[in-house]
Amino acid sequence: MQMITLAQQAKIASVELAQFGNVQKNQALLTIAQQLEQRSAEILAANAKDIEFAKNQGISTAIIDRLLLNESRLQGIANDVRNVAKLADPVGQVIDGGVLNSGLKIERQRVPLGVILTIYEARPNVTIDVASLCLKTGNAVILRGGKETKFTNAVLVEVVQQALETAGLPKLAVQAVTDPDRVLLLELLKLDRYIDMVIPRGGAGLHQFCKENSTIPVIVGGIGVCHMFVEKSADQQKALELIANAKTQRPSTCNTLETLLVEKAIAGEFLPKLANRMKALDVTLHTDDLQKTEGIEPLDDARMRQEWLSLDLNVVVIDNLTKAVEHIREYGSQHSEAILTSDYQLARQFVAQVDAAAVYINASTRFTDGGEFGLGAEVAVSTQKLHARGPMGLEALTTYKWVCEGDYLVRK
């Protein structure tokens, strides 16, 4: 199928879908969740094919972890869809309004964006997360997954389209591009007449490619070079457990800790404790502030600007909070940054000075997630400042229109 035909179909479907209410949309969502559970064996078998292909291609373990589905992860995806169904539908909500001096009654109402193009790599969960959020908000979506998710996505898209049909909604509100040819992606990125927003979910290269080639607005985000600053007043034992969570719970995610900043005043005491704790968790430290032994490697400036997505952690000794903020400005990706401290004033200073979508005081960066923020599933974590920032839930997939009413009112 030509990309322009696919985009035109999506546009027509978005107009149709926008006319349906919450009841039918929720019916489709609940059917999706049910079918994910009932067809789990089929979905996991397809995923096993994708995993085998990825291993044969020499794809990294971090990417394979993102690609992997198991019973637990699939159940989690189904639960997320049910949670989306429980959320209030933002479409039609009146944001604000009133009656002006002219007598004009005016309201600002939430409406769907229209057609969303989502481009992602080895993340089959994105297929369902994005489809469910777009469905809930009355948006059509074009899903362009990577070649690594070919078999899994085929089954997942079939599940979604069948649920749409069962609920009496337009099947083509969710479509997939199955050919990984980048020429086709380039065509899609020029179809601003039909597509309203592009959301890339992948590495820095994918984001840069979309920014450079798209005539459609692009949401930039998902690159998480996340920092944590251990200030001298921090509870060191609690800090070690929090660092372990932020680094090791799921290393391949964008909200995982990548660089730890330790205040110089406590470095001599804290770093040996850190080294022991991380060694027990098979985490390799990259630092110039500890003697090079097993599990400790030299610090690499270039790697401090990138995600590890693995059990590797940069460790840098910093003079004070001001220097920590300067380091984050230089190396951070404006995703999630944290401070561990018992000093409330320093915590507020850190929050005020750090430029990031999410800033934490004595909490793990792993909380930067739509579900954890109470948004349901998310389409992305935006690190830009226009339209949306941080985890993008339902409201981020809407825009608004001004609805104005008068009694044959004319402007004087």
Swiss-Prot record:
Pathway: Amino-acid biosynthesis; L-proline biosynthesis; L-glutamate 5-semialdehyde from L-glutamate: step 2/2. GO terms for cellular component: cytoplasm. Its EC number is 1.2.1.41. Its main location: cytoplasm. It catalyses: L-glutamate 5-semialdehyde + phosphate + NADP(+) = L-glutamyl 5-phosphate + NADPH + H(+). GO terms for biological process: L-proline biosynthetic process. Belongs to the gamma-glutamyl phosphate reductase family. This is Gamma-glutamyl phosphate reductase. The gene is proA.
